[in-house]
Amino acid sequence: MGSKLLTNRLGSLLALALVLACSAAQAASEPDTLVIGYHRTANNFYPGANSALPNIMVNMLLYDSLVIHDHKGNLHPALAKSWEKSNDGLTWTFKLRDDVKFHSGRKFTAADVKAHFDTWKSLPTAMKIDALEEVKILDDYTVQCRLKYPTLVFLTMISQTEWSYSGIPDAEAVKKYGKDYGVLPESVSGTGPFVLKKWVRAQAIELERNPDYKWGSKIYQNAGPAHLKKVIIKTIPEEAARSAALERQEIDIDLSLSTKDAPRLKGKMGLAVLATPQLTVHTIGFNHKKPMWQDEKVRKAFMHAVDQKAIVTVAYNGFAEPAQGFFPEAMPGNLPKEEMAKIFPTYNPDLARKLLDEAGWKMGSGNVRVKDGVPLRFTIYVYTETQAQLATVLQEQFRKIGADPAVKLMEYAAWQKAMREYEHDMRYVDGTTSSPDGASYWYVCNSIPYPNHVYWCDEKTDEFYKTTQTTLNERERLKAFGEFERRLIEKAVIIPMPHTMMMVGVWDTVKDLNLHPVHGIYKLLDAKKPGK
C-alpha cells in the first residue's frame, strides 16, 4: 500500500512539473503573465529562514514589512503607517495599517509582528536584529520594540529591502504548519502583492496576483493590485539553455543573463540587454576549520596568486571590475582607497611561492607542494556555471604556485548543505548588498555555521562589527566598517573577487519593469505586459 501511495505521489509531482513547464512556455506569449528565467532554485519561503537569494526574491513578492526603502535608498512606510523613537533611542513604537489582509483572508495585526520578530530572533539571520530585546503589543494596531542598546540601523535592519527577512507571515499559518511553514506551498500566507499558487522544486514557481492588495508603498506609482495577473519563475541552471529560452521568447526576462551570450543577444530586435553596476560582494572563502588554511602565510599566498584581470576577461567577458577590497568602491564605509592599496595583495605569483616555502610547503612530485606528507590539494565548491568558469581560471592560477585544486559544481541546495556541514575546503559565494551591514554579518562568530560558512571567529572582527551596530555617531560607524574591512584583508580571511554587474535580458513586451539596483524585480507593482 505504501509503495502504491508513493508511486501515485511521484506520478502526481511529475504531472504537475510537466504542467508547469508547458504552461510557462505558453505563458511567455500571454499578456499579463510574466515569465522569468533564473539560475538558482528556492527552497524555503519563511522570511529569515536563510539568506538564499532565490528565496529572498520570491519573498519580496509574497510579503510586506513594516518599512521599505525605495530604489534610491530612502526609507518609506509599508505595513507601519508611522513610528516614533524614544529620547534614549531604546523604544520604537509603530502604528500599523488596519486595512491589510493575509492571503488566507485573516486580518493583519500587531500579534503577527510580534510573532515573527520573536521567531526571527532564533533564525539563522538573527544577527540582523541583535539589538532587539522584546516586542510588546499595545493594541491591535500598535506595536512597540524595546532595544538592548540604541542603534542607528534598527529601521534599516527591519526594512524589507534588507533581504526581506522582516516580511511578516501569517502567525496562525506559521503555528498551524510549524516547521513545514514556507516549505509546503499551501502553508505560505503573506500580505504581499502576489500569492503562491504552485511550486515544483528546482523547476518552477507560479504566483498569482493578490486581488485584495491595495496597501502598496508609495515607492511605486501603483498601490495595488498589481497589473500583472501571474508571475512564473522558471529554474534554468544552464546558461546556454536560459539564453536559448530567452531568444525563443519562452521566458520574458533572464535575470541572470550569461555574459558570454549578452553581446550576441544585444543586437536582437525587441530584446534589451541591461548591464547595471551593482554593490556586489563576491568572495573565495577558506574553510578556517581545515588545518591547511590556519596558517595566515598560506592564505596570503593564495591571495597573491589571483590575477583579477584575467578573471574579468575569461569568466565575465569584461562585464565586471577587479576587486580592490572586500567592499565595492561605491559602498559607504569602505576603507579609503589609498589605505586599501597599501594592504591589498596584488597579483604576484613569485611572492606567493615564497610565502608557501616559508610556511613549510615544499615542492613535491607532479609540481604539487607537500607538507608533513600532506599534498596541497583541495576542492573549490561552486553552484553556478559562471562560478565554475571563474574557479577554473583560479585552478590554473593556483597550479602555478604548486597547488592541486579541483572544482566541484553543485546544485544550490547541496552546496548549502555542504557549507553547514563544513565539508568544503574553499568556497565561492556571490552576493549583492544594499548596505555594508548586509555583507559584514557573514563574518562574525554568531553567524556560524550559516551564513558564516568560512568559520572565521575573531574577537577583533566582532568588535568592529559591534561598533557599527551600536554607535550613534555615523562617522564612527563608517570608520568601524573600514576597520572591519581592513581586518578581513590583513588576516586574509577571504579572497575578494571581481565586482559584477546585474545582467538582465528582457523583451520589449514588458513595460515599466523598474529594476531595483540590489533586488532586481523587487515587488513588480508597476510592471505590465500588455497584449499586442
What are these regions, as identified by a protein language model?
Residues 504-532:
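Long beta-strand-rich cores associated with HINT superfamily self-processing modules
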Residues 345, 354, 405-415, 440-508, ...:
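Extracytoplasmic/peripheral linker and loop segments enriched in polar/acidic and small residues
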Residues 194, 287, 322-365, 383-389:
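Structural transition elements
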Residues 135-137, 197-208, 234-290, 297, ...:
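Extracellular/periplasmic solute-recognition and catalytic clefts
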Residues 37-87, 118, 189, 505:
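N-terminal lobe/hinge region of extracytoplasmic solute-binding protein
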Residues 119, 213-264, 386, 395, ...:
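Ligand-site clamp/hinge motif
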Residues 9, 26-29, 95, 128-174, ...:
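Surface-exposed binding/hinge segments that line
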Residues 72-74, 161-232, 240, 348-358:
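Gly/Pro-rich hinge or "lid" segments in bacterial periplasmic/extracellular proteins
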